[in-house]
């Protein structure tokens, strides 16, 4: 999980979702997981 000020989809499988008011990216590739901090 990467915590970044700006999250962007890295590949086509990356999905942007919102959980508890935080923007997150979920993907099949675990390296692509990101969350806005």
UniProtKB/Swiss-Prot annotation:
Gene Ontology terms, MF aspect: structural constituent of ribosome
A Pfam family reported for this protein in Swiss-Prot or TrEMBL: Ribosomal_L36
The UniProt record lists the keyword Translocase: no
Cellular compartments per GO CC: cytoplasm; ribonucleoprotein complex; ribosome
Domain of life: Bacteria
GO BP terms in the entry: translation
Alphabetical keyword list: Ribonucleoprotein, Ribosomal protein
Family: Belongs to the bacterial ribosomal protein bL36 family.
Name the UniProt record assigns to this protein: Large ribosomal subunit protein bL36
Source organism of this protein record: Staphylococcus carnosus (strain TM300)
């Amino acid at each position: 999980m990467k915590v970044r000020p700006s999250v962007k989809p890295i590949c086509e499988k990356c999905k942007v979702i919102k959980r508890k008011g935080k923007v997150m990216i979920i993907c099949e590739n675990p390296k692509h997981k990101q969350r806005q901090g």
